[in-house]
């Protein structure tokens, strides 16, 4: 059943997260929400938010975990893992895993595992959302236009208790692609 669309202004943030001895990649488009609008808090498919950022705007006390998201470019609400603690929250996970990443536009693995097992040994097996799903989360925003760039986070030690992070903009990228080793244009890296 198709959910009716709602209009909302959009604030965009690019994110990439690596969790639990893995490198994880995430990105999202973040529509601004009115503080009084609690109807789209992401707690159910009927209350799907347009982004993890909207979830955090509606509920500033939101914790990291699974939330329902739905943008005008998506055919139905879906659950995604939202990091609501890093830099004020609002980050959506689009990939995670330890080894075995693919550069396929179709992604890899069971997308439900991103929000069900974002960390720990269960997160070793790679899961990457399809490029179409990531583009739908961005809701028409190009990766190159994400003001915060891309955030990659990976476990620094085998126990997953210390983390290493790098951030960079992804330049001249009109649509999401997992083809990271090809001729990609990256901005400056910060650690």
Residue ranges and their predicted role:
Residues 4-18:
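Bacterial N-terminal signal peptides that target proteins for export
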Residues 4, 24-26, 73:
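Residue-level detector of intrinsically disordered terminal segments
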Residues 12-14, 27, 74:
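Residues at the start of alpha-helices and the adjacent loop-to-helix junctions
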């Amino acid at each position: 059943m198709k959910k009716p669309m709602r209009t909302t202004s959009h604030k965009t943030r690019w994110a990439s997260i690596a969790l639990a001895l893995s490198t994880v990649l995430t990105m999202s488009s973040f529509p601004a929400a009115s503080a009084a609008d609690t109807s789209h808090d992401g707690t159910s498919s009927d209350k799907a938010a347009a982004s993890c950022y909207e979830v955090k705007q509606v509920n500033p006390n939101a914790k990291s975990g699974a939330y329902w998201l739905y943008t005008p470019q998506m055919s139905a609400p879906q659950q995604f893992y939202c990091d609501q603690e890093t830099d004020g929250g609002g980050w959506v996970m689009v990939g995670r895993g330890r080894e075995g990443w693919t550069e396929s536009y179709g992604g890899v693995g069971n997308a439900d595992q991103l929000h069900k097992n974002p960390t720990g040994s269960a997160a070793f097996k790679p899961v990457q959302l399809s490029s179409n799903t990531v583009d739908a989360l961005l809701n028409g925003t190009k990766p190159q236009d994400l003001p915060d760039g891309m955030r990659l986070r990976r476990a620094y030690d085998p126990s997953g208790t210390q983390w290493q992070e790098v951030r960079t903009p992804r330049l001249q990228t009109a649509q999401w692609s997992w083809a990271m080793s090809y001729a990609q244009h990256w901005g400056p890296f910060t650690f």
